[in-house]
Amino acid sequence: PTWKRVFSARVFRDSKRFQTSYEDRVVKVLREYSDMPDKDVMTNEQILKAYGIISYTQTLECKGTVLCRTDTGQTFDTGDFPYGAVLNSQTMEHAKPVNIAKIRRIMTIENKANYENMSYKEDTLYIYCHGFFSPKEVEFLRELTVLAAENVEFLHWGDMDYGGIRIFLFNKDKIFPGLKPYKMDCESFVAAVTLNAGRTLEAEKRKKLEQMNAGELEELRSSILEYGMEIEQEMLV
């Protein structure tokens, strides 16, 4: 992988030229011809990341007690930061989780406001999802599945829309096989619509929802189509 600004400096002799003048056009082409199943809901950064161009903003945010060890043998505990720990890409590259003995629940949360609203609990690990996890994040987080005791609960709380369903399915398939949806059922959806927290479903998203296999979230998919509405987590804060 190459840092975005290093790539730009090497190609254009200007570290910001790629981002300001070419990034959107390059991503448009990559998105159009890519065979990645989630390309339509991936951000520019995620598309570029898949092709080896990375930015400095690749970080993993979490709240909870995870003991990690670097490849030089040093250890650190994310539990020392009860208001949230932030691991940059190089930390994820050179460290991995080695102990989560206190954790009984692991929850990925799609949106920042909802993540920030969750208070530290010694037996719970909250992970800010931000969308689709990068390959580096996926590799790092998979270690949690290996370390987790049999009674650890894996949950995902995300938007009740096309993208939210895709993110849940991605996390379940790529990271946490035992993942279950949290507050993403039909009852939660109807309650949110009743509170006027929904927004109108776009025609293009309706087509995609009609064609998708939503797995465990089939009832949610059907409800979105029935009501013609979708819900973002932030509307429920």
Question: Model-predicted segments: where are they?
Answer:
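Nucleic-acid enzyme cleavage-core boundary/entry regions
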Residues: 1-128, 133-147, 163, 170, ...
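A structural signal for isolated positions on well-ordered beta-strands in alpha/beta enzyme cores
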Residues: 106, 125, 153-155, 180-181
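Generic beta-sheet signal
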Residues: 129, 157, 182-184
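Short, conserved loop/helix-junction motifs that constitute active-site signature segments
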Residues: 146-149, 175
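Acidic beta-strand-to-loop metal/phosphate-binding motif
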Residues: 151-161
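Long, hydrophilic "mature protein body" segments
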Residues: 154, 176-179, 194, 202-204
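Conserved beta-strand -> loop -> alpha-helix junction used to position metal-binding or nucleic-acid-contacting
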Residues: 177-191
